[in-house]
């Protein structure tokens, strides 16, 4: 007979381990165990049967894989945690003995990252383990940037030391400098949560959130210890990424940092970038003893001859490009672009490549901006520099690093204002004109001729659309256009607020709206015709009514049929047939009258627009009916499972179409009301 297996040596009891057992096995504290699991990417598991997985009688809630805990036993940081734990025990024993001098000596050797922001251990090897390639690190950079930008804007507290905040801010500014140099920033969006940014680095789209620079109130219900563990890991990760990015574009990392300028809130201006020659084209330097050796004249002549032969095709291409007109160049360029069309009629719309007339990296290169005091200086400066602007000025209150602090500088072309327009008082103009040479700040509401005044949204809309928008739409006090998210992907059939309404409407939808408006117009015309009835005929009717006793005797007899008609709504088909019979009888009577009088019957003139609309409506209805019949025939050939799936798809598509149609109807109503308002 085989031996009886002991309980807890096989199955789920062997594969899973509780958190208490894991902490006891690693011989570290619970906070250190949490840190280690976060850094190594180990998270709790849920066994199928908790009773079988638990070796004790008590109900355990948190389980881990036994292999994961076994893997943590070989981690280098565990030794540092054990040393710290032993040091904490020595400090507590010294305090218990009353030896304050020995406790202070041991405290100086202890690691306090929550106070100093420095640790005795290194996370470099963990970064290399979790991200074997640089692309893997870029893919996981979204949460890293969002967390570090959040901590860079927090106030310093006991749980969030000032050194940690300064380290986060420094890493974020270094990353922004790379985006400015490499022109990698693509889009940005203003939301309630903060400002979203999207950059493309080595083909990877990175999206992160930056909070607005308001005074933050730190509450006690947030566990900053866990967040601080993530920040400690993300600081090391972003340091690796920044080093790799800087070296890829030929810059020295870390860049020079001016602490004095940073104390004056210079921001990006506190860093000075230096190139180390990587990626730069330089002439090779020859090391000699002081006398430069002259090249062989024969060898030099042969080299020059070969260079002329190599450069001949390039010169011919330049000459042909100069002789050809610009229009032909554009046609040739556009013909070389491939157009990607969806394989199926209901497929998603693919992004089409196109030649842009303006380079996004030089969108603001020709302008000089001045930022008013009420505008978000840090975000505007970053976006403007990332899209080619070199000259940005702001008020001295906003900090150092500006191109100019003089608001009346004549070189300023655009001024960003985020305040309501104020009326200029003419009495104070003379006093300010006298001291115009020394004044650096204009009074509120004053404007300089020749300068464009815009609201901050103009900059965001320009970079998202990769073109300069009309500045008059974003003037101070103007009703701003809707600020739409640039991260939404276009899907066929979905409502697109940026596209014209005519391009999104279905043919039958537009015809239905037109027919509805025509019916309303006909009803209004009938009402006006009744109101404008001839008074003579009205008098005749009244006189005849007075002469007849049956018609004018009882008002109740007249009201009774009306009430009956209102209450009863049946026999609709019978009423329609009666109406058709009345129209046929009237037409027959007109034909007889025309035949007796010997005059040809005059047909009513039909409006060609109405006829075209009715024909198109019939055609659309016929097409929809054919599509429904084709769908029903195809469903008959399907199995029950596939038929159910198809019905779910059709239902969801109809629901989406109904939502899009409701949004289009709302937009159509708004546009019509906007067009009709000026006429009144």
UniProtKB/Swiss-Prot annotation:
The keyword Nucleus applies. Residues 611-673 form a coiled coil. It is found in: Nucleus, Nucleolus; Nucleus, Nucleoplasm. Residues 312-351, 494-642, 654-680 are annotated as: Disordered. PROSITE patterns: BRCT. InterPro entries: BRCT_dom, BRCT_dom_sf, PES. GO terms for molecular function: ribonucleoprotein complex binding; RNA binding. Belongs to the pescadillo family. Component of the NOP7 complex, composed of erb1, nop7 and ytm1. The complex is held together by erb1, which interacts with nop7 via its N-terminal domain and with ytm1 via a high-affinity interaction between the seven-bladed beta-propeller domains of the 2 proteins. The NOP7 complex associates with the 66S pre-ribosome. This is Pescadillo homolog. It comes from Sclerotinia sclerotiorum (strain ATCC 18683 / 1980 / Ss-1) (White mold).
